[in-house]
Amino acid sequence: MLKWLGGSGGTGDGTDAKLDVAAAKSFIASLPPEDSVRAAQDVALWLEGLNTEAATPVALRYEIADLVDGALKRHGQRLLDQYLALKPQAKFQEGLIWRSVMGAWKSLGDAYVSCADQFAVEKSAVNRKKLVQALARAMRAQMLQIKWILLRYGYVGETCWKVIGHLHAQAEAAGCLEEVIEIYPGVHGQGTIRQELLRTLILAVSSTGGLSPLKQHVAERAIAHFSRDFVSSGKMAEDCNFVFDLNGSAPPARVYAEVPRNAKLFFFGASKALDAVQSVIDKLNDTGTVPNDIGLQGTAPEWVADALLHLAFNWEKELPERDYERRKVAMTLQVTQGFDGVQAGANAPVQETWVIENASDEGYGAIVPERRGDWLQVGVLVGMRPEEDGASWGAAIVRRVESDARGQRRVGLQVICRTALAGTMCTMRAGGGRGTPQTVTLLDLQPSKSGYMQVLVRPESFTLREEMELTRTMDGAVFVMDASGIVESGPDFDRVRFLTKALAEY
């Protein structure tokens, strides 16, 4: 008996459960409307049960998978919104959401793969439309799993690539790679299996380890919008600067990467999408607003611009040379977390030791030991001190996070100061009074020749519209200044540029 239908969506003990549409609708109605984590977990378990029912007619299994898929959409979107709003330190909640979503998308993908395989075996003309739709939806589910792995800066393993290769083979055998179908209901629901494949592969080669989770999401939505302009070929071609082994033996990569033996090569590239992305970037620069036709309404223009610039850079036929030469080194790096870690330095309660494997004038490439750095994401601030004679505690920002097949993480750090200096800052009021002093970190010892200094402050600690007074802790030097602009912001810091007006001594 189908005991998996018991619990939140079945008949209680499951002894008289029946696999039919009514049972699926009953299960969907039982999903907790305001607890999307629980709903995703229940969906994953329920679909796992569905996937064991091979003796059930495939048309019925597909109809049920479709119903559950529709119910999962709202919860999946809510969990994505919650995930992107999390602070890097919220690891328990991050892990809970991530595991729930991944379990649901994997079970849904498995359901569609199973249905597609059965449709392909039966070769029924009646079910051909469902075969094509099942293949496209299975490919979409693989893309969503890859997206969530990348959001966590994880490594996409061989299993995903083999499933993608298998789905392509099924579509090729059925002659439906280019067939335009309704993948999902809605205005933007039409597409082809080839587009779904290219959307997945382009996401994988877009170096999302250089984007924050929120900008990764923006990039994925942009990739979906531009996917009709992507191209592919069975042989090397002008606009196809990436390659994938359809046997699933390795992740997609640039064509100059080593190709596995006996590979079935699939070449692809952004092609006209690169020009289309650049056109949107130009419009953003001209108007300061996000165009309505790219599906990113309501997204901050600066996030869209950053994500699109990143995509355009990584889709180019050849990557430009680095601005700074990397030098191989072997030393350790003491690391502290966030704004508080920068201020505390050696006194921080939590410190980690990373291994530097290369260095440049701009920063470091480091290896993060196993079970360390689970709080890492692009854009976070770290305090750091290299293992060098006379080195001070400085500050850096994480610019890249990547994982390999062994789970080892590599991090790219941009150093924003080699010696971080403590200070306090307060607002200077019109009547001569002072606001409450707040602790800050000076990134510059003195103003530049043109009078500018950069300072790290906590977000929203100042309006930055009034005159400010900065006191350098080590010697009591005072700087009177106005904010010139926020250079960048992170989860727990604003990096602000100030123009100094006067310098006095206490």
Predicted regions and their residues:
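Generic N-terminal leader/targeting and pre-domain segments
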Residues: 1-151
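Extended, domain-scale alpha-helical bundle/helix-rich regions
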Residues: 156-323
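Short strand-loop-strand
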Residues: 293-389, 400-415, 419-420, 429-506
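Short, mixed charged/polar active-site loops
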Residues: 391-393
